[in-house]
Amino acid sequence: MAAAIRHDWQHDELQALFDLPFPELLFRAAAVHREHFDPAQVQVSTLLSVKTGGCPEDCAYCPQAQRYSTGVNAQKLMETDAVLAKARQAKAAGASRFCMGAAWRSPKDRDIPKVAAMIAGVKALGLETCATLGMLSGEQARALKDAGLDYYNHNLDTAPDYYDSIIHTRQYQDRLDTLEHVRDAGLKTCCGGIVGMGETRAQRVGLLLALASLPAHPDSVPINKLVQVAGTPLHGSAELDPFEFVRMIAVARIAMPRSMVRLSAGREAMSDELQALCFLAGANSIFYGDKLLTTGNPESERDLALFARLGLQPMAVQVDAEGHDHGGTVHADISADTPGCGCAHAA
């Protein structure tokens, strides 16, 4: 019997899963994964930053915050033709979804028609579309949906009780409100967080509890491992134990059985062996390409070699004109180069 989809997880239940002996936790997570997905199929994603740097927020992990000296230069919003050129390249390389990220606290209303034109153009190429632009109003979310947007990324970042240690310029409720606007507009959600920012295991549990308690589980759950960037307040933080990261993947898979669980930022520093454990634990999505926002990502050749060694295949997707997934196929996220309001830690 397939694992039930629950929205009533309790903190002590998820904590008990985290605390299981490592082999037992992986066994349980792998079993849940196989109930809902082909374990040999992995969703492949890349990102294009359509507006880099200059963000007014103070997220302690983010090299795009203008208040930190990180060497990231602010750039204006890209022209639509330049974005579409990147989208064509992505499609030619086998992409099926193109994601556009902008380093904004929230887009201004005057920005929406420009982004909508990008979305419509990408959609016309036959690609799925996703975006991460910061906080959205309900009207903005509907405008993006009308333009052809399929997915919207907006992360919770961390547990509610640790959030104020990381961010002061945006409230947790602001994030929940944006997710509500996105769902109400009929968009699919991509929502996860970052680990390795000094939080406790109980707070990692709290992040997963917040995600699994949303009215609808996110379609994609990116689990980012902190990429320490010189100039940001979190540079020099203690490194997260690799097995703790795998535990995070495993409990995410058990708590949200039908969501795509994505290895996101931080994968560049992971060994092939660690990534293999993550796939065994239920990860079935990665970011692919040479850059992930403003931080590195494993070279494409390394990813292809790892897939070959493990016998993994990229997922395919077929989406109808209204953006609905067909049957057993799942998205193969696509984009191009670098940020959004996931900064170094992405969609």
From Swiss-Prot:
Record pathway: Cofactor biosynthesis; biotin biosynthesis; biotin from 7,8-diaminononanoate: step 2/2
Reactions that this protein is recorded to catalyse: (4R,5S)-dethiobiotin + (sulfur carrier)-SH + 2 reduced [2Fe-2S]-[ferredoxin] + 2 S-adenosyl-L-methionine = (sulfur carrier)-H + biotin + 2 5'-deoxyadenosine + 2 L-methionine + 2 oxidized [2Fe-2S]-[ferredoxin]
Top-rank lineage group of the source organism: Bacteria
Domain called Radical SAM core: residue spans: 40-258
InterPro entries in UniProt: Aldolase_TIM (IPR013785), BATS_dom (IPR010722), Biotin_synth/BioAB (IPR002684), Biotin_synthase (IPR024177), Elp3/MiaA/NifB-like_rSAM (IPR006638), rSAM (IPR007197)
Keyword Iron-sulfur: yes
GO MF terms held by the record: 2 iron, 2 sulfur cluster binding; 4 iron, 4 sulfur cluster binding; biotin synthase activity; iron ion binding
Cofactor note: Binds 1 [4Fe-4S] cluster. The cluster is coordinated with 3 cysteines and an exchangeable S-adenosyl-L-methionine.
Binding site for [4Fe-4S] cluster: 55, 59, 62
Any matching Pfam family: BATS
EC number: 2.8.1.6
Keywords (A to Z) from UniProt: 2Fe-2S, 4Fe-4S, Biotin biosynthesis, Iron, Iron-sulfur, Metal-binding, S-adenosyl-L-methionine, Transferase
Cofactor(s) needed for function: [4Fe-4S] cluster; [2Fe-2S] cluster
GO biological process, one term: biotin biosynthetic process
Residues where [2Fe-2S] cluster binds: 99, 130, 190, 262
SMART domains found in the cross-reference section: BATS, Elp3
Function, as annotated: Catalyzes the conversion of dethiobiotin (DTB) to biotin by the insertion of a sulfur atom into dethiobiotin via a radical-based mechanism.
Subunit composition and interactions: Homodimer.
HAMAP family: BioB
Family affiliation: Belongs to the radical SAM superfamily. Biotin synthase family.
Identification of the protein by name: Biotin synthase
Organism: Stenotrophomonas maltophilia (strain K279a)
Source organism phylogeny: Bacteria, Pseudomonadati, Pseudomonadota, Gammaproteobacteria, Lysobacterales
